[in-house]
Amino acid sequence: MIKLARSAGFCMGVKRALDIVLELSRTGGGPIYTDGPLIHNPQIIELLERKGIRSLAGRGAPSRGLIVIRAHGVSPERREALRRIGLPLHDATCPDVAKVQAIVNKYARRGYEIAIIGDRGHAEVEGLLGYSRGLGRVISGPEDVEALDRGAKVCVVAQTTQDVRLFQKLAENISARVSECVVCDTICRSTKERQREAIALARSVDAMVVVGGRNSANTARLVTICGETGVTVFHVESEKDCDALSLRHVNRVGVTAGASTPHWVIERVVERLGAILSLERRGATRCARLIGQGLIRTHLYTALAAVCLYMAACLFQAVPAQAPLALGLGACIICVHLAHRIAGRGLLSHGEETLTQEYYHDHRKSLSFLAVASGGLSLWIAARVHNVLFICYLALIVMGLYYSFEEKIGKCVRWNGGWSLRTVPASKDIFVATAWMVAIVLGPRLVAHAPWTFRATAACGYVFGLVFIRSIFHDLRTIHDDTIVGKETIPTLMGIRGTELILGGAMVGMCALVLASAIPMGLKIALAVPFAYSATYFALSRRRFAAGGVWCDALADGQFIMAGMSALIWSAAGQG
């Protein structure tokens, strides 16, 4: 079992700094230079360099472009030096760091000595010293406290990513030594939450894996903090380091990550750990895992989920389900979703893709054949059933392929003036939900020449809502990756909290729709089961019980399986 800390990965300050430089890179204006590495993570630095975002370190003053102050902040002297270069200057200093700078400046003006509890030489600490008017000193341990004058008046602040317990201990020592002491707890909330969760997680598992750059101070602190609980701790920078870990006889593994660690690195580590742990299991278990991964990665499982949702929609509308329509629907889903997965590789490339995305690249020829064969089968079935269904499936496949390969098509055919469907806010979520709704509800109903009823409208809303919820679940998992590659998904626009409110509202609204529909009470209960499942999945995902990679997709599709199975059970029992 793998448990992933909810706080693992980017903090607010890092995400904000990334958002700023990525937005600047999208709007143009020449090369972008950051005053030192934007964040302490080699994978992110490499990705930014490929986007033309480079560090000023080791370079002369640039003659064109713009300069960005990184999240760690800078001293007033350094800020003035950057201004003298003469290029536009943008400030990506973390707001929490800026607050500490203001506190240091305030008390330095009043003549207080400034005791900064932090790491000597760290960029944030060096910037804070610049605001201390020569009255600052770095406190890294008890020996530094002894150097303070007993008659001094001291203001104590902390590096925002400092060890909470070390800060409290040193602050108490300083208060006991000097005549006047003002203690300002400036450790940021995300750091406190990350450390608190890491300690709790470490106490509940057999081993801890901390993911992050070797030169990241906050990652190193997490390693130390977890180690103090007595659990075995491993520090890895990527999934390549996992193969050397000794995990024999380990049943529960906790995973956390530093504030500069991107999502795809965490997911690759979780996937690799899952594969390593599975090797310790019996042969039958390993075989079942491989079969499950194959079904999910080829989207056969997604096709089965779509068929289950189709059967639930038929029961919702009181129309009979037809085997040819179910088979054609499943084949159409495989074609479109596989094409999207195959085309998706390259948005994050050169090592930033997850192991699942890497799988689609390594097997792209065989998977492309499966996608083409599935598309052909769906169109052949549709043509034999009805011309309307053929046109419906053909339109869905063409639109799906265009959306997936739009970037490559645009390079060959310059007819859209540079406009991209991918840049339309929430376009993927709406497109996928609409496509499933058309294939599952509208197409079969047009074929049957059935009159349009309120229950048909409700069925459209039911299918659209469930697929929309599934799509947002996926977007929440990939929010940081989507921000980096410029995808305008709901989470990148609304933030995590705003998206969670939308999810909650969608679930409540869908339950209300089911209850308001003119269908028997038994079937109402059956059709409401998927929302209970989604709520449970959402609650567990917030706690970050990590399934990892493809298994997360399988769990999200589980609501469709539940919809079909529960509706069929109620129908077979004579309750619908």
Describe the residue ranges of each PLM region.
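Transmembrane alpha-helical segments that form the membrane-embedded catalytic/substrate-channel core
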Residues: 331-346, 395-410, 438, 462-477, ...
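Extended hydrophobic alpha-helices typical of membrane-associated regions
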Residues: 354, 422, 526-576
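The feature marks the mature, well-folded catalytic cores of soluble enzymes
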Residues: 1-257, 261-264, 270, 274-278
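The first (N-terminal) embedded transmembrane alpha-helix
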Residues: 293-316, 369-374, 432-440
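Intramembrane alpha-helical segments
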Residues: 358-447, 538-544
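Helix-coil boundary and interhelical linker segments in multi-pass alpha-helical membrane proteins
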Residues: 309-328, 377-391, 441-461, 513-524, ...
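Solvent-exposed interhelical
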Residues: 339-372, 465-508
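Glycine/small-residue-rich hydrophobic helix-like segments
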Residues: 195-239, 244, 250, 480, ...
